[in-house]
Amino acid sequence: MKGATKKMAYQEEQMKDLIANMVNNIQIQALHLDLILSGGAFNAIYLVGCLYFFREMESKDKIIIHRISTCSASSFVALFYLTNNLELFETKVYNMIVRNFKQNKKYIFSDEDIISVFNLIETTLYDVNGLTEYEILKKVNYKLYITYFDIKKCKRVVKKKYRSLHDIFETIKKSAHIPFITMNCMLYRNRYMDGWQPFIFTGTNERKQLFIDLLGRDKIKDCIVLKNHNKKNMDKIINGIHDAYSFFYQDGKYETAMCCYISDYGVASSIKYYSLYAFSYMLCIFLYLYVFFFQIPSHNIMNIYFIRVSLEFVKNAFYHFIEYYCL
C-alpha cells in the first residue's frame, strides 16, 4: 500500500514538472478568457487534464479566467477547479463515481452514494481546506454558471448565484441528472434534468470564449464505457494536458480535438452543438408531456399504458447495453 502511494506521489510530481515546463513554452501573457465546458459523463477525467494546465497558466499570469459555463459532469469539475481541489476529483471522487456505477450496474448513484460523495466534498472544503461558506461562495458566485432543465416549467435554466454550499450541490445534482442513468429515476426531485449543453456567453464582451468539447469523435465512446478505466485514467489526463498545450502553443489559431474559441467555431462544430441543444429541448418537452400531462387519469388509459411500456422497454434495453458493453 505504501509502495502504491509513493508511486502515485511520484507520478503527481512528474506531471506537475511536465506541466510547468510546457507552460514555460507558451508565449502569451495576461490573456483574459471565459471557459465553456461541455458535458461528457465519465469524460470529465479528460477535462481534469485541461484544467491542470489552465491552473498552471493562471499561476504564471499567462491567462486570467473570469467565468466558467458548465453543464452535467463539467459543473462538478469546475467547482473543484475554482476551489483548488482538482486532485480530489482525480484521486477520490472520480473513482468513487466509477465504483458506484460498477456496483449498481444500471445507474451511477443510489441515494446513499450521492450523499457520500457530497459529504466528502463538504468535509474537504471545510475541514481540510479550512474554507468558510462565505469564502466558497466568493470563489463561485458569478464565476460558475451551471445549466439545467426545469421540466415542470419546460425551461432551460442558467444559474450563476448561489445562496449556500448546499445550493451549489443541489444545482450540480440538477445539472448532472441524466434520466435513469445518474440515479434510478426519471427526474431529480421529480422536476430537474441534465443541462446537456453549456450556456454560451452573450453580449459584446471582448474576452475570448474557449470551448472545451468532451464529446469529440475520438472520445464519445469513453463517456460511458468504463472497461479498464484504471489503466486509462492517467492517459486521459495526459491527453487533456497535451490538447490544452497544443492549442495555446499555436496561439489558439487552430482548433484541437478539445479546444476551440467560440469565435472560430466551424460549421461542423456549430451543427453538433445546436443539434444537441435542439435534442435537449425536445426531450424536455417529451418529459413535460409525460410527467405533467399524460399522467393525468382523465387521459386515454391505452395511450398511457403504451407510453409506459415503451419507456420500460427502452430503459431495460439500455440497462442491458450498459451491463454487457460498458462495465
Predicted ranges, named:
Residues 2-68, 79-327:
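Patatin-like phospholipase
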